[in-house]
């Protein structure tokens, strides 16, 4: 059985640091990809990237409540911004190494933003404050199903990775983010755009293997939503 590494958050639970990956990601790897999920911790001393790459066949970079530290792209953070700099220290070097090595990877939500920052891009920290932009945040005080409900359409790049995987030109996606791509990293290319022009998915022009980043959460209904099924099936074929 192929193995897919799932990068964990480092969070406090009952005053203790824990390494966490939501069950939806684990289930999507197990059932949507047909691979063994392997949790990769984000430790205060980052693990050796070469050792990680040697033990897995692919990597999944997950979403998280925290944000990539703005210092990673030369900006400052507002007071109260939730960060996970231990995760940054694990994921950013790992993304660069995986891209260089041609390791198949799928990056979701925070992982999508990490991919852009790791390769030299930057982020808008508060999309809803930009003139003419949608509010990409999830509804407040809503049920979990309502939070992850389809929120807006995305339009795929013609002949791009998502268009080829899904056979679609457009699809509805969920939206649970307040940050997003500002400057696109060298080598990355837009795969999907929201109605306000915000980049919602990327691939890499020089990728040696499957490399896809999406701002939305395909893991939430990976077995039901046609686009999500296509994404995880494409990832599986690349392992």
Question: How should each PLM-predicted stretch be described?
Answer:
Residues 109:
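Conserved G/P- and acidic residue-centered "switch" motifs that form tight phosphate/ATP-binding loops
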């Amino acid at each position: 059985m192929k193995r897919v590494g799932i990068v964990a958050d480092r969070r406090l639970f009952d005053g203790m640091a824990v390494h966490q990956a939501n069950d939806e990601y684990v289930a999507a790897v197990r059932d949507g990809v047909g691979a063994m999920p392997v949790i990769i911790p984000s430790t205060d001393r980052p693990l050796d990237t070469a050792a990680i790459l040697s033990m897995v066949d692919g990597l999944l970079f997950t979403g998280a409540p925290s944000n990539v530290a703005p210092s990673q792209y030369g900006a400052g953070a507002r007071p109260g911004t939730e960060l996970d700099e231990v995760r940054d220290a694990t994921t950013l070097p790992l993304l660069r190494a995986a891209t260089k090595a041609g390791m198949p990877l799928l990056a979701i939500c925070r992982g999508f933003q990490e991919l852009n920052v790791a390769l030299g891009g930057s982020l808008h920290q508060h999309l809803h404050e930009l003139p003419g932009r949608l509010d990409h945040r999830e509804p407040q005080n809503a049920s979990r199903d309502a939070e992850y409900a389809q929120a807006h359409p995305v339009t795929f790049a013609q002949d791009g990775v998502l268009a080829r995987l899904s056979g679609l030109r457009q699809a509805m996606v969920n939206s649970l983010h307040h940050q997003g791509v500002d400057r696109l990293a060298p080598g990355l290319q837009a795969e999907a755009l929201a109605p306000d022009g915000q980049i919602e998915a990327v691939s890499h022009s020089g990728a040696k293997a499957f490399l896809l980043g999406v701002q939305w959460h395909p893991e939430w209904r990976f077995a039901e939503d046609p686009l999500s099924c296509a994404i995880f099936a494409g990832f599986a074929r690349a392992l």
